[in-house]
Regions:
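C-terminal and inter-domain tail/linker signature
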Residues: 1-146
Length: 146
């Protein structure tokens, strides 16, 4: 696949699997059976298309209106780097935190490796502390000083 085709594959992942209006079954077309996803909020790696679907379900359950916007993509060889912004309303439990109704915004980067037209590995990096602060699970510096 060309670098442009690799970038398009990752756009499909963001728009069709992880955004609220997407189709989870598209994960079967995008992720290889041996897919491994590394995420700072998951103590264990995500595995296979079913693991990607489960991760997407978790975010969709916590943020039914979740939206991911791709800000930039860079591709070289079998790698694609996608810089994204996620937003949504906290309406379901997230990592033991009850719904707050808070609007959240998270900036992140995903580095993906493509093989034979499918994603075989992802490394996600995002502001997990900022997300937990927006959900009220961790005090902000201002709250901690009060």
């Amino acid at each position: 696949m060309s670098t442009e085709e690799n970038k398009a594959l990752l756009r499909r992942s963001v728009e069709e699997v992880f955004s609220a209006q997407g189709d989870l079954d598209v994960a079967d077309e995008i992720y290889a059976p041996n897919y491994v996803g590394h995420n700072p909020l998951d103590p264990e790696d995500v595995r296979g298309p079913e693991g990607a679907k489960e991760q997407a379900r978790m975010y969709r359950s916590a943020f039914p209106d979740v939206r991911l916007n791709i800000e930039e993509q860079v591709a070289e060889g079998d790698r694609v780097v996608t810089r994204w912004i996620g937003s949504g309303t906290h309406q379901g439990e997230m990592m033991g935190i009850a719904p707050t109704g808070n609007q959240i915004r998270v900036d992140g980067i995903t580095i993906s490796r493509i093989q034979d037209g499918k994603v075989v590995e992802d490394w996600e990096l995002f502001n997990a502390l900022g997300l937990m602060q927006q959900l009220g699970g961790v005090p902000t510096p201002e709250e901690a000083q009060a």
